[in-house]
Design a protein with these regions (language model features):
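Surface-exposed, low-hydrophobicity beta-strand/loop segments enriched in small/polar/acidic residues
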Residues: 2-217
Length: 217
């Protein structure tokens, strides 16, 4: 068995193939010594509930294209599907009206952060928002909503849409603060970020992590 192991390491031209062969041989050694029937299998997949690939991740609307950054990832572990969205508000504009949608200046439409679907995110059972960087330039009291419509516009009231309040901060965010969602986006809803206070401006900072937890339906 040791000879077979060494041969596998020496003979594999692909280093990843060598690692796989080595692990397979180690499994054989353990099984022979213990009478077990261990096997190699993939525990996690970087995918959505139905094996979504990088080409089918959430896509932000044109109305927030000026945002400094936007990143989305899915992880499936067993039947648990976790969706993570990191947004940077830098470059976007908040009006001077409470619960107005934040987005590109000039009332840009489709100021959403992606559509939540069961196929990608699973059937939702929970969610939370974490402040990674305290907003500056605009209000630091930021709220999170979802809505049926994708057409919500910067400087427009999110309450003019068919909306659901996910997280209302009730005051200024602090770095590292996490708030659980008091309600969840309905399937096929779009995500929006809004002013939580009547204070406007162009954001020069403000990063948030939005997490959604679901199960493979």
């Amino acid at each position: 068995m040791v000879a077979k192991l060494r041969q596998s390491i020496r003979g594999a031209s692909n280093p990843w193939g060598a690692v796989k062969d080595t692990l397979a041989n180690l499994v054989e050694v353990v099984n022979a010594a213990t009478g077990s029937t261990l096997s190699l299998s993939k525990a996690d997949t970087q995918a959505g509930a139905t094996g979504a690939s990088a080409g089918t991740l959430l896509t932000k609307g044109a109305g927030v294209s000026a945002a400094e950054s936007y990143a989305v990832g899915f992880v499936r572990n067993g039947t648990l599907v976790t969706t993570r969205i990191v947004v940077d508000l830098t470059g976007l504009v908040g009006s001077g009206t409470d619960v107005d949608i934040i987005g590109n200046t000039g009332g840009a439409t489709s100021a959403h952060w992606g559509q939540v679907t069961t196929a990608k995110c699973g059937a939702l059972i929970g969610g939370r928002v974490t402040c990674l960087e305290v907003p500056a330039g605009g209000t630091n009291d930021i709220d999170f909503y979802s809505a049926v419509e994708s057409t919500g516009a910067q400087d427009g009231l999110v309450t003019s849409l068919t909306e659901t309040a996910l997280v209302t901060s009730g005051g200024a965010w602090t770095s590292g603060a996490a708030k659980g969602m008091t309600a969840l986006p309905a399937a096929n809803d779009y995500l929006y970020i809004t002013n939580g206070a009547a204070s406007g401006g162009t954001f020069t900072a403000g990063k948030f992590l939005i997490e959604l937890f679901g199960y493979a339906a």
